[in-house]
Amino acid sequence: MISRPWQFAVGVACCVALAFPALGNGSSDASPIRETVLPNGLKVLTKELHAAPVVTVWTLYRAGSRNERPGMTGISHVLEHMLFRSTKAMKTGEIDRLVQLSGGRHNAYTSYDYTAYHITLPSERLETALRIESDRMLNCALDPDELKTELGVVLSELQGRLNDPEELLEESTRATAFLMHPYRNLIIGWKADVQSLTRESVLEYYQAHYQPNNAVLVIVGDIQTEATLDLVRQYFGGLPGGPPPPPVLTREPARMGERRVTVKGSGSTAYLQVFFDAPAAGHPDHYAFAVLDGILTNGNSSRLHKALVETDLAAALSSDYAMRKDPGWFAFYLTARAGVPHQHLEDALTQALERIRKEGVTDRELQKAINQVRADLTMEYGSVSGVARAIGKLEMTVGHQEFDRVLDRIRQVTAADIQRVARTYFGPDSRTVGWFVPEGGTTGPRLPTGGRGSAHHRPAFLADPDAGSGASPSQGGPTVAATGKVIRHVLPNGLTLIAAENRVAKSLAIKGYVLAGPVQDPPGKSGLATLTAELVTRGTATQTADELAERIEFLGATSSIRSERETVGITAQMLTEHFDVVLGHLAECLRAPAFPPDEVRKAVGQLRSRLDREAEDPKAVARRELFAHLFPPSHPLHRDPTGRREDVDSITREDVVRFHTRFYSPERTVLVVVGDRTPEEIRAAVERTFGDWPPQAVPSPPRPPMPGIASAPRRTITLPGKSEAIVMLGGNGITRDNPEYYAAFLANRILGGGELNTRLMKALRQDGGMTYGVYSYFHPVLGERPWVVSLQTGPAMVDRAIATAVAEIDRLRDRGITAEELEEARAAALGSLVLSMEDQMGMAFVLRDTELFGLGIDFPVRFPADLRSVTPAQAQAAAQKYIHPDRLVQIVVTPPQPR
């Protein structure tokens, strides 16, 4: 039974208080996976993890795009969307409401081999998740009107892909790599197929594939196994099994040689994708492939990063290899550097792969890749969601029994295995080569994750590269956090440390910042802060950029120092035994960068390339224009963090040195360390490493207030080669320390700050079918937080979408908020308090923000009471005071109107 919201809010507050010591003394030790099969064929996999009072429930169906017949592509993904709609027992929105009232979060995704639904919530609310999943397993209503609306949402999502040339290239390259097998198709489906889907076809597919004997239920977390299985039998035991679903009979014919495809379109950036044939999950070569993937592309010290990015041939690179039910692919994705001839980049990739085929890899490269897997597994398994995701993915491909064997299998891989696999699979006759050739104009690319072009990625048996299509796009990390054994300590030199013990895994997480972000850029030097942050890791007095990257990546640790709008963000994660090394690495980079001239030259060139790509990205253009119109040129938030091209071109090494000397100092630095050490041990390590860093005492000038926004004409920017419009509305907001902040926060959460059940989502997505997602938020900056609405829609629906959004804002301001809405929003926010304790990095993220925004270290304890104090009348009053639909800047980035 679902309790009343106010009762649960009190329960969450108690749960947080009780969780303080539990987290401090918790252990990552856990029971083995237990397999139970019900008489109806439902397989249930349970695993107890008692480090936090959280449970996650994953329901996986063997129904992915590989199961779709010709002409029916995308039906798995459409059905995934419909399972968030009405059932015979629940109306549309009820699933989202129940999860929110339980203080949980939920989502789903469709992959090539399966579809997964997941709900994570406080463990005392497990029954809610089971009730939802058992109901929608067989009882989805598939209402014709709801299906029509949801098809519009999916088509909007599909059209959004056309804004990205990498997506366009990938669909053509994959369709060329596979001639017959369903892996050639888009998970989201081909447009004509999606448009032709009917209720009858979706219902037939649902009844054939969604049944207990074609599903797996994975439950991981703070549970008692026997009691949990009793609940599972109660909710699922009476569901009837069905006949086996139709088997996938299509097999890809043997390849007869290399294949090529070229896609042409608007833009200024070229992209290269190379797909090699790869074996199915369970093949003896799988783990050698996984290790080779790490050697080639995992981090700045990887083979291909050094061969292609450091030589200025590629601006970015990544790879895609994962376990798949049938023979699949190993793909490389490269963004060409401006001015590089296409053949030069392709030849360089071929030569790098040929070198491994002929010479093999070194013992150090092999050990580094194994170390990375060990570290990734440790950190991934530090959350119940990570464990459940891994178990579910393995069960869908090779069997969950592999869960406890992964690391041993990886350790058994030899250098000879790596060379044999490269020789076997990376030959020229086994590849499909795709090029996107720009023809002028603009089009938006997928931006690289890291400034140096390569990013740390999860190993192939953990990653879900196929899982890009979900019912509700993720809105980022946890909102709040709590922990026991937490201290705040200011070193004599002014550096602030927040240390928290959290032993959910044998690892630690670091989040932090230096008050040296782009808001500190001097006039005429926009981009200087971003460039400086990029360069602090590119060489010190004692180590080169390659040596710095190699030292950290060999341990399997991750470390980054990246410019954000307000600050320079610090992020690191490592196994417990490597904490001191990683801390020393961060100290060396922050305190003593050498800024080698050659690295400065390369970084300036890479920042220019990033500016070029951002100028072609509709979302980046919209953000830049919005802030340029919300703040005057004299305000530090007016300028974009990446800078202007002419300013970047003028930056010299001397500018970088001066900026670093002025703004990188201990009294401007905050470190948050959470993990498998006591706060006292963490403090001692930080004092040893940073204690002798001399302070600079250079205060920042006071920031001018945000000006009042009056009604402004719509600003429309056209970008050729696009298919969808990006809309951003923005106006004045509220400061974080305002006593009315929580009332405004809850009003916004009801309007558009949650997930599927907000008023804006209901009006524009569920009822209107105008967008895949629409969100509102108070943008988290220091000082007044602008209020923003963002959405993607078809160019022809821009006026209707904006009018609908404004109408919903007016309705909230004029008619108020119901007590039920307020309690749902409050319960959802309070529930995130528990869920944020799920892993170390999430906790560190929140504790960092409590310091940045001056909330106080006791913020997690005060948060429940602060929310409970808000009444519906106060929330409405806050909306009337801080959200003004008639005083919004309107930015629209859209394709040109057809002639």
Model-inferred region functions:
Residues 29, 37-39, 50-53, 110, ...:
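Extracellular/periplasmic catalytic domains that process cell-envelope and extracellular macromolecules
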Residues 151, 171, 200-235, 429-431, ...:
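Non-catalytic, conformational "gating/processing" segments within enzyme and secreted inhibitor domains
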Residues 27-35, 157, 175-215, 243, ...:
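Histidine-acidic residue clusters that define the catalytic metal-binding segment
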Residues 155-161, 251-265, 371-380, 574, ...:
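Short, conserved secondary-structure transition motifs
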Residues 12-45, 224-264, 306, 404-513, ...:
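Proteolytic maturation boundary segments
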